[in-house]
Structure formats: structure tokens, C-alpha cells
Amino acid sequence: MKNGKTCFGVIIGTRAYFNSELAKDVRKQLLKTLDEGGYEYIILPEDATPTGSSSIETREDGLKVSKQFREHRDEIDGIIVSLPNFGFEIGIINAISDADLNVPVLVQACDDENDKVDLDSRRDAFCGKISVCNNLYQYGIPFTDTTLHTYSIYDPLLKKDIDKFAAICRVVNGLRHCRLGQIGTRPLGFNTCRASEKLLQRSGITVVPADLSEILYAAQKIKDDDPKFIEMCNRTCNYAKVPDSYKEKLGLQAKFSVAVENWIEANDVQAVAIQCWDSLEQNYGCAPCVTMSMLSEKLIPAACETDLAGAVSMYALALASKNAPALLDWNNNFAEDRNKCVCTHCGNFPKQFVGNGDLKLGPLGVLGRTLGKINTFGAVYAKVSEGPFTFFRISTDDPKGQIKAYLGKGEITNDPYGMDGCIAVTKVDNLQKLMKYICKNGFEHHVAMCRTDVVDILNEAIETYLGWNLYVHE
């Protein structure tokens, strides 16, 4: 990141015996597209090489780029290679391999025009791109392709491909440097929420643990005149409707939220998994659902039941979409419609995911019957608005020593369903096939969702760069 924006290292490839004006035009239009998209970039000065236009050809040119890229290592999120003509693979591959940034790479090449293939106008980038990609493959450098093999630098596809690539960079870099909070142990009754810290760490995901008692002690020390506490009470009331009968519980809930947010900030955590039952209700007197909902709303995904892998799944969706994700149970069949099911949770969905402002706070439903309604206040009640969604789930498979995942998309319907908590009636094509895959491959009953289509983004990020075992549901 540079100045809070996604930053690309830009390489313009060329060959001296092609018209240098082709590279000049491509440089101008590519940088214009990046500027209009709100991106930062690192590129050689126009006069840095004999071919001009910031373009590179030889190994020596490539080493100038690699030196520049290394100087901006902490800023560059991905590398964009643009080929205005055939390009020269030697300069490009030396630039990328010597820089050794370990970031995603996008390779784009320009169309020839049928009436402009004379010696002054021809590009041959169609062929040159194959050579550049062959070199990347030889060097073991993973890369992303554009929608079409070649297209005009003025084609709207360029912006779409860059925006998609930026999202891929966010996912890859975000997960490789993620600090994942764990507040409390998993619930006693949920072996299904086990996860391997060591397998997560191998992908760059560091688990940062805290005992639940630390958070409860911090919450109990917060005074009623603490500005953060007063602000949290107001934020919560503005976020969801608080019934008059539970107003006295709002303070307890708000202090827990402040303690959690303070811990997250102090430990530089990007996502968190929380032990949401039943110690918190028995030893403190509230449920953490609205805390988790409000965290997810501001893109700090918070997973229930100390589901570490679920929190990672939510974070991946947040990075890909820049939208608030939710963690749901694949919970109920929907009558005898075998492509529909009810996805629900006690009450942790963020407002953006719900898609409407009709959120109300109350006690947990099932747990409220056993732990007492007064001790389980904090659940969000909401009916999710209809529309598309992406679903995603990772799991650490210890026997196989790998991280595995599944990915797909569906529709949330407007069907009524008489259940408390957060409710989403979903429709997924070939749902029975998906359920068989989940069961046969030992996945958990939790699934992460967001309200936009980011299947292609996650597919590319995982298969090309993260190397997890991925099933994409069709």
C-alpha cells in the first residue's frame, strides 16, 4: 500500500526494433487508467533506458527495475507487465525474479490491428506474451492472465482486469500477513471448530490468543464515564433497536464491546474468533453477537464459537469484496425444495450483509432457554434481504497436512421462515451435490458469505498464489 491505496509495480516491455511510439502510447494510457482507478504505482522514469517510455528490454534494464522495486518493497502489492509489442523476455524476467517481491503478477498484451501490420505499426504482442509467460513458468513465478489473451490498451477490459487483479492482491497479501485473534477456547461441545494453528501459519496466518477472562476483566474495569463506553452505547443504539426491557443490559454489552475493540487494536488483529457461549453468558451476563456484528460491519470479521478457520474465510471475503461478511450455519432444509436451505446463526450478521436497517437486539433463542434470557441479551434479530451471495469456507486438514476450501455462489430469497435470530433462506444450484462434498470431505457446518460475486477473485487468489486445495461448486 502507498498513501492508503493499492500500489502496483509497472513494467513496460519492448524490443528495440519495434516502433518506440507504441510503448509511449501504452505507458500513457495504462498510467491514466491506474490514476482514474485510484491506484498508486512505481515505474521507471521515461528516460531510464535506451528504448524510452519507461520500457525495458535487456537484463541491465531489468535490473534497474528490480532495484527500484526493492526500494519500494513495502509499498508494492502486485506487478503489472504490459506488452505494447513482442517485448523482450530477458529484461522482464530479470526485473521480476531479481526483485523477489513475492506478490501477484498480471500479464497484459496489446492487440494488433489488421490494417496496421507494417514494420512501423506491428506489435506481435500476441506471441510475445506467450514467451513472457513461459519464462515466468520456468522461474516458478505464479502470474494472473487477463480476460482475453490480447486487447487494445483503450479497451474497458483493462480497467476491469486491473480492478480484479487489485482484489486478488488484497486477498493474497492480506491472508499472507494476517493476524487472527482468538478470544477464548472453542466451546466444549464443538470438536468441529478445531483448527491447526501450524497449518495456518504455513500460509502466513498468525493466531493471536487471549483468554476470555482477560477480556471480561478488562470490561469490568471500564467506568460508566469512560468516553469509549458512552460512545459504544450510542453506536449500539444507532446500529440496532434495543427493546426497553433490555436497556439495563446495554451497558454490560457495551463494556464487553469496548474491551474487545481495545484488545483488537492493541494486538493489531485483522479478524477474530470469539468463544460466544456459554462461559460469557454464565460468568458475565450477556451474549457477544452484536459485538461481532458491529466488528464485521467495519470489515474486522468476527466469527462465532472460536471458529478460527471460519474467521479466515470471512476475512478472505472481506478482502475480495470490501463488503461486510457473515458466518452462518448450513442449518435447515426448506420444505422439499432440494436446492434451497435455511442459513442462520443466533444473531451475528452485520447490517451491510443483512441489506436493510431492520435490526433488533434481544436474547439468544436456543441458549436463552437454558442459560436464561436475561443472561443472553446481545443477539441480533434480522431477516436478510434477497439478492446474490458468494459462499466460501476453508478448513485445516491435519491428516493430509493441507488447507482445503470450497467456493461458490447462490441467491438469498425472500421466502418467509419463522425462526428467531438472523435468517437467510438461500438457493444454490445442485445444493445436494454441495452438501455431499461438504460431508464427505469433513468440512465444518459453518460457512462464510458476502453479498457480491467474488468467486473468480478467490478462485485465482487461492489456486494460483495460496496453493490451497479448492473445490469450486458449479
Spans of model-derived segments:
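Short beta-strand elements in bilobed, periplasmic/extracellular small-molecule ligand-binding domains
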Residues: 31-52, 142-148, 206-211
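Glycine-rich, highly charged phosphate/nucleotide-binding loops
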Residues: 54-74, 88, 252-259
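C-terminal catalytic subdomain
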Residues: 299-417
